[in-house]
Every structure is written in structure tokens, then in C-alpha cells.
From Swiss-Prot:
The gene is HOS1. Its EC number is 2.3.2.27. It is an enzyme of class 2 (transferase). InterPro entries: ELYS_dom, HOS1, Znf_RING/FYVE/PHD. This is E3 ubiquitin-protein ligase HOS1. Pathway: Protein modification; protein ubiquitination. Induction: Rapid and transient reduction of expression in response to brief cold treatment. After recovery, the level is maintained until 2 days after cold treatment, before declining again. Pfam families: ELYS (PF13934). One of its GO terms (biological process) is vegetative to reproductive phase transition of meristem. The lineage of its organism: Eukaryota, Viridiplantae, Streptophyta, Embryophyta, Tracheophyta. Its main location: nucleus. It comes from Arabidopsis thaliana (Mouse-ear cress).
Length: 927
């Protein structure tokens, strides 16, 4: 049947025809296919060549077409008539048998008789008498045999023809026609011819309506098999050229790329046609305009919630390149290269695209501007006709994202079976299915979508988890889940080097969860890992995002600055100054805290920087910082109008800071005191300091010179992991519950503010591990002051910090219904003693923490004295410290806290301060 009438649309389908199918149960068809499958491939050229009878008749050659070969020798040299009167083969002179079958039908004519090759092709080949047309006829007959092999699941015949004949250097012939048929160019031309005809058929079918296309599904499936066959042929041909650089190889690769995209697009079109392009499945969007507006709103929310870029600080309001997951995925789809002139425009897969406007829109607005797709057909065309064919998995994931976006929030009974069928059709695993779903949910700015994503994440997190997942969770104020994602994906350590962006995200997550000691250990260990890698490779080089190159000192600067800025934002400066910073890290800590004090002199950050040096018995540097802070405060007061309360706080801070610094200077020898107070201290060394002195002048914004790495306390480096392992990480099985707090406690903080006030009426208790060192009855930051053993390295004493943002107990109670939290609770063996164990009549003093007021832990809950982060061992022999003795003579006074409140403040009124003109903006000010 040449034409078909489909649902009354005879004119639309008239140009599309289905070839008459042979009767595969008949013996001639079976014999022909068996002969084709078992033939010696070197004889395939001889079978395809047009032969004429070589017998002489009346002193001339017979010249008739030869349809048979001689049985003894297999030469096609005699026609049927001449075979009856000749006794020998004209070619090899072998004797013909006198009895039995002398002739056997040639393979080509055997296929014609069986109906595998149309007789019109056979007649056309015999009508060509001229030499140039005769060569074309021979090639056409070989193509016909290839077509028979392709249409009958014998494409391996063509593949073996390439490897065993075309690529065999011994396969040669003196016959120019046979020599031409032995060349691989013939096979490549056959692939182009077949692909061209397939494109024409597909284009006609794709232009039909949905109902019409459904009637041609059988034809589409047959085309899919053909395209898959010629694609496998090109793979074999490409492997034969492997290792060589030639135009032929480039031509084959380009052709294979086009055929691969056609196959992928054809498969997705078959699925869409089967489901009627989901015309019967209602979308949750009323129209395309509303959908497009919602995607724009998602993009706007992503920009608003994006964190500042810790790497690129070129602008005041520098933020990370905020983007949605769908935008990143579309950007990764590479555009196809320019086609060579040899292939021709008739081989471009763009012919199959129905609507050219969507492609032009993506060219104008960028790749990400093509989303959302107007309909299912546009989605199939945009994804599978463009971009590399090797990105088929990513394209399928984007298609799933589109389906989830189109139908989520509607009843699952209407669309879930469609998603499941898509996954089953294309072999998509449940993990990949849920991953696409999570990407959509994290792009959706609704709280419902975020909760659903948090419920699914435990099932799909692993080593291959996209690093941006943790970043987006952090941006959406869910650092606890982000931390779990890092742990589940194996990125909570530094076993492997990561990009600088991933490292910053991991640091931010830990700080936001209150894990300051873990964040500090992470940045320290990572920088050492980068330095070791630089030395091992013999070059200060590490490839990160977009192939940027960073030295280990630049890694340290970025991570330490980020750590300090986050601590300032969360009012945790009083905790980070107690960490064991090495001299290289101190340089960036000093700069960051001093910049913060310059931007906001009314805060306690500058005073805490003085405390940082006093705790390390580096009195001269504390004196220098105090002098600089006094100048900054004087300039701030003179240039701005500030409230009385802010003025009182600043004066109190300055008074007590100066008094403590003066007392510290009094400890120095008299000669040094005179030199310091006379300003002759620039070339002096602090005799009580064993560590390297950090530079006090302003350093440039980006330190590019290589800073020598100072040897740090090896005990800390060796025991960092053990100390972290000893820290309780869960309460009732949750990884978010902190361990016992040791050192200065913090308070509940308001999220999103750079500097916030503490809870009204709440006093912070600052305690030492052993309470061996006391400065009178007043509360001062020097309660934890201790002298390091033999050097100025501060040995930290904190075992675990907890998030001041989230009440963990309340978080667990509200979220224990989630299945992944229940699983963690069941599997986590770590438990923490409940605070209810403390009796009401206990003599223990309540400890103020950012989780509320609780009793101080029992003695058996204290940190082991051998812990390198424990400060108590260094305090045992310092009860008679001069500073402590002098401090006991004072009563009352201002107590510096990171929340910027004094003990006497019952109610606080916020006073806005005018910005200082001409002052350089710091990166943390943009937070």
C-alpha cells in the first residue's frame, strides 16, 4: 500500500508511504536473509556489482546481464542461455558439471525475488549502460544490500564490512569498481543517504497533528531502529579512525552527533505521541504567561537570598551569581558546532523543530531564557535537538524537572503515572528521578517545597550530590539540613580537595550551625591540604571554579575572612578569639576585626581584638590596637550624631579597655613601659610573646605574596579529629544538638542583622574551665585568660559550639515526624544527658547559653584535661598572676560581650548612626 487514509486526512498522509512488507514466513525470504547473514563479506562487493555475460557469440561477447553465479567457482560470468552451451567458466576455465544445478541465484537478485528489494531499483540499475552510470548502479546495489541488512536486524553485517573489508589493507582488487566498493567512503555515503531519507520522513510525520502522528507510531518505531543502526555503524567507523586526526574523522564525528540527537529526539517524540503531548493532563498553571511570571519570581528570590561572594569582592554589593538549578542545567547544554559544508543543510537536525521562535528566544535571552517551555513539543525540540548528544541524561533530567514543575501541587493520581512511565521507558533510576524532583523543589521558593525537599534529601544524598544543594539550603535558612547533606555526601571532611566555592559553603554551614571549633578545624586542615598539594605538584596552583588559580595563602585569606565575617554577623567574636590561631591566620583575623571596628566603632569588636592580644600576653600589640581604636572612636563621635546610650557605651568600652591595657603595660619592665608610652615601640619585640608578631599596618586587600607557614602546635593538628570526635554531636539522636558549652556563652540572636542586642534582662555568665584565674568579683573578658606553655599559641578549650539561630530541642520536636530524622535517631548511638537530671536544689549555677538557661555540667562532663582544645591545664600554675591580683582591686565595670550589651542594661533603644563619609566599605558591611 503506497498511501494511507488516516482519520479522514488523506491529503496530509499521501506523501508518506509504508513499503510493502515481505512475507517473512516464506522460504525465499528466509533463504535470502540466511545467505546475507552468512556470506563472506569480501564477496559482498562481487554480489553487488552488475555483471554481463562473457561468452562469445558470433565473434562477439554476449553482453546480457548475469543474474546467476556458477556453482563450482562462484563467478558471475555466464547468462542462463550461454551456461547451457558452455562447458568451462570464461574467467577461471574450471569445468562445469554436466548434471545437476550449474547456476545459483546471485544474492542481490535473490533479495529481489524474495521482495526484500524493490524491482524498480533492479530495473533502474539495468537501464544504465554508460560507464559513469554503471558505477553508480553498482554502488546503489550495494546500498540496497545494506538496507536489507539494516531493516532486518542484520546491521552487524555492515559493521563487520567496515572492520573486515574496508579497514583490511589486504582487501584490494585490480577491478576499479570493486576497489571503489571496498573503500569506507561508500559506507559513510550510505549512512548519509539513509539519514537524509529518514529526516525527510520524520519531518513529514512531525508536521501532522497529534491524532495523525499517533497513527504513524509503527513507522516512527521503524525509523528509530534504522537511526540506531546507522549510529552503531558510525561508532565502528569512528573507532577505526581512533588515534588519528583527519578531516574524515571530524566528518564522521559530526555526522554521528547529528544522528545521535535525532535518535534521542525521536525516542522522546514517540513517548510524547503515545501520551498525546499531555493535552489531557491538566497543568497547574492557567497559561504560559503566569508560568513565566512565577519563574521570574523564583529568580528574583534566588538573587535576594544569595550570600555575598567570598571570592570576588570587586563591588560593594558583590553576591554570588545567583541562579536556579534549571538555569545551571540549561547552561551546561553545549550548543552544537558549526556544520561543515560537506554535510549540507539537508542533514541538520534543526529541520525537525516545529517552532523556531523558542530557539530564537534562547539565542536572544540566553539558554536559561528558554525556560519555561511553552509546551511539551517545544521542550522536546529545545532539549533534544540542541546541545551535545552525550548529555542525554542531563536532558532527561531537565525534561523531568519540567514535568514536575508543570504538575506538582495537583493531585498525584492525575500525573504521577506519567512520571513513572517516563522513568520506566528511558531506564531512569529512582535516585535520578528524586534528584530532579529535589532540584525543582529547591528552586520553588515556597515553604511547602522546601519541607518536601528536606524530606527527600536523606534518600538521595551521596558522593555524587550536587554541591549547590547545601548552598541553597543555607541560603534558605536551613543550615542544619545543609550540614546533614554535607555529611551524607562525604564532604564534611577534607579527604579530597574541593573548589574554593564549595569550601566557603562548607565553612558557612558550620558557622551557621554554631560549630565554630569544627569550622576552624576545617579551614585549618583544608589550607594545609592545599599547601601540601601545591608543594607536591611543584607549583602554587589549584584549579577551582572556572579554572581560577589560588595559592594556599589566598585560600587561607578567603576562608579566615569569611569565618570572621560570619562570626561578626552572628555576634560570636568573643568565641573565635579563643581559638588557636597561628600567626598567618592572625594577620587576616586582625584585619577583619579592625575593619569591623572601623565601620562600627560603637560595637565591641574592636575591644575584643584588644582582648585577643591580652589573652596571649602580647601587651604592646594590645596597646597599639587600643590607640588606634581611640582615634577611630574620636573621629566617629566628631563626624556623626549619636545617641546618649551609644555614647555612654563607647566611653565605657574605651575607659575599661584603656584601663586594662595600662595595667598590662605596667607588667612590662620600666624601660619598656617608658619606650611604649613615649611611642618608641615600633621596633620593639614583645618579650612575653613566643609566637611571630603580626603586622599592625593595614595590609592590602588581597595578599598575593607567599607568606612563610609558621610551625603550629603539632598536638592540636594531630588531635584535631580526635577532639572533634569526642564532641557530642546529637541530642536524642539528632546531629544538630550541641555538646556541653565550655567558655563564654552566647545569646539568642536575631537572624539577618549584623550586630544585635541580647535578650533583655539576661546576663551572660563567662566562666573558666577550672576557675583558677579570677579578676575580682567583676565580670571581665579576662576570666579565660591563660598563658600558653612556652609560646603564645592559644590552646582553645571549646568542645563544640551550637547554633544560636535555632533551638535544637524545639527543632527536633517539630520535625521528628520527618522520616529521615527518625532514621538518624535510630542509628545515632550518641546521647547527651538531659538537663532535667539537675535538681532544683542543686548548688550549680545556671549557665546562660543561646539555647536558654541551663545548669552547668557535672564534673564528669568536663573536657578531658588532655584535650588540646582545653585551656585548664595551662591555668593551673597561674593563680598568682599579676593581672589577676590587680583586677581583684576593682569592683563592677563594663563587661565586653559580642552582643554589645552591658550588665546594667534593662531596656535597649536602637539608635541609628550616620555613616562616616569617605570610609571604605568592608565586605562584611554588605552582609
Amino acid at each position: 500500500m503506497d498511501t494511507r487514509e488516516i482519520n479522514g486526512f488523506a491529503s496530509a498522509a499521501r506523501s508518506i508511504s509504508l513499503p510493502t512488507q515481505p512475507n517473512y514466513s516464506s522460504k525465499p525470504v528466509q533463504e535470502a536473509l540466511k545467505h546475507l547473514a552468512s556470506i563472506n563479506l569480501r564477496e559482498l562487493c562481487n554480489e553487488a556489482k552488475v555483471e554481463r555475460c562473457r561468452a562469445t557469440r558470433d565473434l562477439a561477447s554476449c553482453g546480457r546481464f548475469v543474474n546467476y553465479v556458477l556453482n563450482p567457482c562462484g563467478h558471475a560470468s555466464l547468462c542462463t542461455e550461454c551456461c547451457q552451451r558452455c562447458d568451462v567458466c570464461p574467467i577461471c576455465r574450471s569445468t562445469l558439471p554436466k548434471f545437476g544445478d550449474r547456476l545459483r541465484l546471485r544474492l542481490y537478485y535473490e533479495c529481489v525475488e524474495a521482495g526484500l528489494i524493490s524491482r524498480t531499483h533492479e530495473e533502474a540499475s539495468q537501464d544504465s549502460d554508460e560507464d559513469e552510470h554503471q558505477l553508480a548502479a553498482d554502488v546503489h546495489r550495494l546500498y540496497s544490500l545494506f538496507d536489507v541488512a539494516m531493516n532486518n536486524n542484520l546491521i552487524s553485517v555492515v559493521c563487520h564490512y567496515i572492520t573486515n573489508v574496508c579497514m583490511d589493507e589486504t582487501a584490494v582488487s585490480s577491478d576499479p569498481v570493486i576497489a571503489f566498493l571496498l573503500d569506507e567512503v561508500v559506507v559513510k555515503d550510505w549512512v548519509k543517504r539513509t539519514f537524509r531519507s529518514t529526516l525527510a520522513e520524520l519531518q513529514e510525520i512531525y508536521n501532522l497533528e497529534t491524532k495523525e502522528m499517533q497513527a504513524w507510531l509503527d513507522k516512527l518505531l521503524r525509523c528509530s531502529k534504522q537511526v540506531a543502526g546507522i549510529c552503531s555503524v558510525l561508532e565502528v567507523m569512528e573507532s577505526a579512525f581512533k588515534g588519528s586526526v583527519s578531516p574524515q574523522l571530524q566528518d564522521v564525528q559530526t555526522l554521528r552527533e547529528n544522528i545521535g540527537k535525532t535518535k534521542q529526539h525521536l525516542d522522546i517524540m514517540v513517548w510524547c505521541i503515545r501520551h498525546g503531548f499531555l493535552d489531557d493532563v491538566r497543568s497547574r498553571y492557567s497559561n504560559f504567561t503566569s508560568w513565566n511570571a512565577l519563574v521570574g519570581e523564583r529568580k528574583s528570590n534566588a538573587v535576594k537570598r544569595a550570600w555575598p561572594d567570598a571570592v570576588d569582592q570587586s563591588s560593594d554589593c558583590s553576591v554570588q551569581s545567583a541562579s536556579l538549578f534549571i538555569e545551571d542545567a540549561l547552561e551546561n547544554l553545549e550548543r552544537e558546532p558549526e556544520y561543515s559544508q560537506e554535510i549540507g543543510a539537508d542533514l541538520e537536525v534543526g529541520r525537525l523543530q516545529k517552532d523556531k521562535r523558542s530557539f530564537l528566544r534562547s539565542k536572544i535571552e540566553g539558554t536559561s531564557g528558554s525556560y519555561p517551555f511553552e509546551n511539551l513539543r517545544t521542550a522536546a525540540d529545545m532539549l533534544f535537538l540542541h546541545g551535545g548528544s552525550d548529555l542525554v541524561v542531563a536532558k532527561q533530567a531537565i525534561f523531568l524537572y519540567y514535568l514536575f514543575d508543570r504538575h506538582w501541587t495537583t493531585p498525584e493520581k492525575y500525573w504521577k503515572h506519567t512520571i513513572d512511565d517516563f522513568a520506566a521507558t528511558f531506564g531512569i533510576t529512582r535516585h535520578s528521578l528524586l534528584e530532579s524532583f529535589v532540584f525543582y523543589l529547591l528552586d520553588d521558593h515556597s515553604e511547602e517545597a522546601l519541607q518536601e525537599a528536606c524530606r527527600i534529601l536523606p534518600e538521595i544524598c551521596g558522593p555524587e550530590t550536587y554541591p549547590k544543594v547545601a548552598q541553597v539550603l543555607l541560603e534558605r535558612d536551613n543550615p542544619e539540613t545543609a550540614l546533614m547533606v554535607l555529611r551524607w555526601s562525604g564532604r564534611d571532611g577534607v579527604s579530597e580537595l574541593v573548589s574554593i566555592g564549595e569550601a566557603v559553603t562548607a565553612l558557612r554551614v558550620r558557622v551557621e550551625c554554631g560549630l565554630l571549633s569544627e569550622a576552624f578545624t576545617y579551614q585549618r586542615t583544608l589550607c594545609l591540604k592545599v599547601k601540601e598539594n601545591n608543594l607536591k605538584n611543584g607549583a602554587v596552583k589549584h584549579a577551582s571554579d572556572d579554572l581560577d588559580i589560588w595559592s594556599w595563602t589566598e585560600w587561607m585569606e578567603i576562608l579566615v575572612n569569611e569565618f570572621c565575617c560570619l562570626s561578626i554577623r552572628r555576634n560570636l567574636v568573643d568565641r573565635i578569639i579563643e581559638l588557636p590561631w597561628n600567626p598567618d591566620e592572625e594577620k587576616y583575623l586582625h584585619r577583619c576585626l579592625l575593619d569591623s571596628a572601623t565601620d562600627d566603632p560603637s560595637s565591641a569588636v574592636g575591644s575584643l581584638l584588644v582582648v585577643f592580644y591580652l589573652q596571649r600576653y602580647r601587651y604592646i600589640q594590645a596597646y597599639q590596637v587600643d590607640l588606634r581604636l581611640q582615634k577611630i572612636e574620636e573621629a566617629f563621635v566628631s563626624d556623626n550624631q549619636i545617641g546618649e546610650e551609644v555614647m555612654f557605651r563607647m566611653r565605657s568600652q574605651s575607659h575599661w579597655r584603656k584601663e586594662l591595657v595600662d595595667r598590662a603595660i605596667d607588667i612590662l619592665p620600666v624601660i619598656q613601659q617608658q619606650q611604649v608610652r613615649s611611642g618608641q615601640f615600633s621596633e620593639m619585640e614583645d618579650a612575653s610573646e613566643g609566637a611571630k608578631k603580626s603586622d599592625l599596618p593595614d595590609a592590602p586587600d588581597m595578599i598575593t605574596s607567599s607568606v612563610p607557614f609558621a610551625t603550629t602546635n603539632s598536638v592540636f593538628l594531630q588531635s584535631a579529629n580526635n577532639a572533634r570526635a569526642r564532641e557530642p554531636v546529637a541530642n536524642n539522636g539528632s546531629p544538630f544538638q550541641p555538646g556541653h558549652m565550655i567558655g563564654n556563652a552566647s545569646h539568642d540572636l536575631s537572624h539577618g542583622r549584623l550586630f544585635t542586642n541580647a535578650n533583655r534582662g539576661q546576663k551572660s555568665e563567662v566562666r573558666s574551665v577550672t576557675k583558677n584565674l579570677k579578676f575580682g568579683e567583676m565580670s571581665t573578658p579576662f576570666k579565660d585568660l591563660n598563658r600558653a606553655r612556652g609560646n603564645s599559641q592559644l590552646q582553645g578549650k571549646r568542645t563544640e559550639e551550637s547554633s544560636p539561630e535555632v533551638n535544637v530541642d524545639r527543632y527536633i520536636e517539630n520535625n521528628m515526624s520527618s522520616p529521615y530524622l527518625r532514621r538518624i535517631t535510630a542509628n545515632n548511638p550518641v546521647t547527651v544527658k538531659s538537663s532535667s537530671n539537675h535538681l532544683n536544689g542543686s548548688s550549680q549555677k545556671p549557665e546562660s547559653t543561646f539555647f536558654g538557661t541551663r545548669m552547668q555540667p557535672d564534673k564528669d562532663n568536663f573536657v578531658d584535661l588532655d584535650d588540646p582544645m582545653d585551656m585548664s591545664s595551662s591555668l593551673k600554675d597561674n593563680n598568682n598572676n599579676v593581672l589577676a591580683t590587680e583586677s581583684r582591686n576593682n569592683s563592677g565595670g563594663l563587661r565586653w560581650r559580642s552582643d554589645e550589651t552591658s550588665d546594667d542594661e534593662d531596656e535597649l533603644t536602637s539608635f541609628g548612626s550616620m555613616p562616616v563619609k569617605g570610609r571604605r566599605r568592608r565586605r562584611f558591611a554588605a552582609r
